[in-house]
Amino acid sequence: MRRQRERKSMPDAVKKVYLIHGWGANRHMFDDLMPRLPATWPVSAVDLPGHGDAPFVRPFDIAAAADGIAAQIDAPADILGWSLGGLVALYLAARHPDKVRSLCLTASFARLTADEDYPEGLAAPALGKMVGAFRSDYAKHIKQFLQLQLLHTPDADGIIGRILPDLARCGTPQALQEALDAAERADARHLLDKIDVPVLLVFGGKDAITPPRMGEYLHRRLKGSRLVVMEKAAHAPFLSHAEAFAALYRDFVEGGLR
């Protein structure tokens, strides 16, 4: 069972939202976003296997992670995935279409690394440099990562102070390594044509990890999707531009989705 932070709904709530974090993080990455979402929404932020408080059963597998979340969903839900969590969300929507009402993918990807027919991906050396820094001193570099995301954000210190203590409990080194290896190997491009739900894509114009070209690729492949690029955001638009992001997502979910 994956641990999750859950916010109960008001009695008339009809929507259920699941938030899926990215690599090297946990459910507390969404602690600043959750209070900005409508109080009538029941919201669950889940931990991926081996992250946060969730147990780790080897090996880390993207499809298995999606299946585990699907097992928690009892009616079509609105799924928001960030970075690696967006990849998990794609697998969830393709493998369990009856469990997904809509998708919001923010700073995410169908494939992370570049190849001959996918120039939108990252070059391996750039990815390796970033990951190496996190491996050497996670607590130091996750704080620096947050500081960079919130560079021009009012109350940046307050946001970091609220989420960093719980976020720093990132999971076991083995789980993080296997999750990264799985992300590097994963290729969900063959799943995109199977997805037939409303999709909102939100990317940061200054994101060097999942640059907007990855969002443009998803937009071309996911029929009926909507792409929004927040020009001054980087890899975590829901943190750096929390109010705008929350309003955008609220309008997407409550405004008919398409």
Swiss-Prot record:
GO cellular component: cytoplasm
Keywords assigned by UniProt, alphabetized: Biotin biosynthesis, Cytoplasm, Hydrolase, Serine esterase
Superkingdom as given in the UniProt entry: Bacteria
Amino acids binding substrate: W23, S83, L84, F145, L146, Q147, L148, Q149, H235
Keyword Hydrolase: yes
InterPro entries, per the entry: AB_hydrolase_1 (IPR000073), AB_hydrolase_fold (IPR029058), AB_hydrolase_sf (IPR050266), BioH (IPR010076)
Coiled coil: none
Active site: S83 (nucleophile), D207, H235
Cell location: Cytoplasm
Disulfide bonds: none
Domain AB hydrolase-1: 17-241
Family to which the UniProt record says this protein belongs: Belongs to the AB hydrolase superfamily. Carboxylesterase BioH family.
PANTHER family documented for this protein: AB HYDROLASE SUPERFAMILY PROTEIN YCLE, MONOACYLGLYCEROL LIPASE
Protein name: Pimeloyl-[acyl-carrier protein] methyl ester esterase
Organism: Neisseria meningitidis serogroup B (strain ATCC BAA-335 / MC58)
Gene that this sequence comes from: bioH
